[in-house]
Amino acid sequence: MARVLLAEPNRLVCRFIAGILTDFGHDVTACEDCTEAAARLTIGPIDVLVTDMVLRDGEGSTFCKHCVTRGIRTITLSGHEFRDAQAEQDCPPPLVEKPFRLDDLQDVVDAVAAAAGSTRAAA
């Protein structure tokens, strides 16, 4: 199980993705903008950031870079098509394009969480 910080500006999409990640077994903290997400970082450790490319009060890519400097693994979601070079410049991989398959999201989050060393065997 990973401690996931989810930053998604659309309230319904945020709740949906948070529910999915919780069903996958992760401990999810959800927020809708950069300010709230930054505040959540001060509360406790986060293993994985899952953020939309564009948030209400800033760019998810900028917040993503901030998290990377803190050693937090990141996953960026986007409803826009990006060229590979543009996506890599704007945010570290992986980039998951919306709409996505639930299994694909689970695979990416699990892989990033494992790389962060936060997963553990099911009891």
Q: What are these regions, as identified by a protein language model?
A:
Residues 11, 32-36, 103:
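Acidic phosphotransfer microenvironment of two-component signaling modules
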Residues 11-29:
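Two-component/phosphorelay signaling modules centered on CheY-like receiver
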Residues 51-68:
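Conserved phosphotransfer microenvironments
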Residues 75-79:
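Hydrophobic/aromatic residues positioned on beta-strands within the core alpha/beta folds
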Residues 88-96:
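As written
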Residues 100-117, 121-122:
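C-terminal output helix
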